[in-house]
Amino acid sequence: MIIPCIDLMDGKVVQLIQGREKALEGGSPLEMLARFAAFPQIQVIDLDAALGKNLDNDSNDSLVELVASRCIARVGGGVRSPERARALIEQGAYRVIVGTAAFDREKLTGIANAVGRDRLIIALDSKGGKVVTHGWREATNFTAEEVIRHLEPYCSGFLCTYVDKEGMLEGTDLDWFRRLRAATSHELTAAGGITTIGEIKELHKLGIHAALGMAIYTGRLNLAELALLNA
């Protein structure tokens, strides 16, 4: 499955390079939903919340709710408490994505209990070979391949981002995704640098979904062609 991404920052749809440099702004969330109407699921990431900004009074909340109420949406960014996870479900999110909190056993258990493991996706973001957290700003000392099996009991799938190539339109690391596929039977979604139809087809052979951002916002990949692949 191909999953278009809507990333929100300061109330706008944006695309970043490696989670830091803003590369472009898209249309409004409703305009993006109209463009992505042929796709069964949309991924929504609140970048401000992921970076720890305005967690208690997030300016993007109304936009997240707007999108989630109009499509089947997986929503993430700054989900670090059971209350936040539950609120997103109540706003219309079909599934919730948890990153940083997945590495705090108490928080992860609380979130999984709050929304149910079937509605929980854990984000495993890799940079320089190691898992990174807190909006990709803090590195751990372990790899995604090492921890993925330990996290399986808490979720129904993983969103795995190859941060080294995120937003750079230079292709992703298919070998990394092959190793992840060998490490778990859980649902996997690949993100980070996916630029060609060939990469998407290779991921499909592995049984891995593709979350796409920069490649579709820049027109590198054609939405009509992607929709046919998704059919």
Predicted regions span which residues?
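C-terminal helical cap(s) of enzyme catalytic domains, especially alpha/beta-barrels
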Residues: 106-115, 120, 200, 204-231
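Conserved anion-binding
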Residues: 8-22, 93-166
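Charged helix-capping and loop-helix junction motifs
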Residues: 55-64, 137-146, 170-179
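Structural preference for beta-strand elements that scaffold enzyme active sites
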Residues: 1-5, 41-44, 72-74, 94-97, ...
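Short catalytic helix/loop segments, enriched in acidic residues and glycine
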Residues: 19-37
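Catalytic cores of alpha/beta
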Residues: 63, 69-95, 175-210, 226
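Glycine-rich, proline-tolerant flexible connector loops at the mouths of alpha/beta enzymes
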Residues: 41-59, 100, 160-169
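Non-catalytic positions within long, well-ordered alpha-helices that form the structural scaffold/packing
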Residues: 35-37, 89-90, 151-152, 204
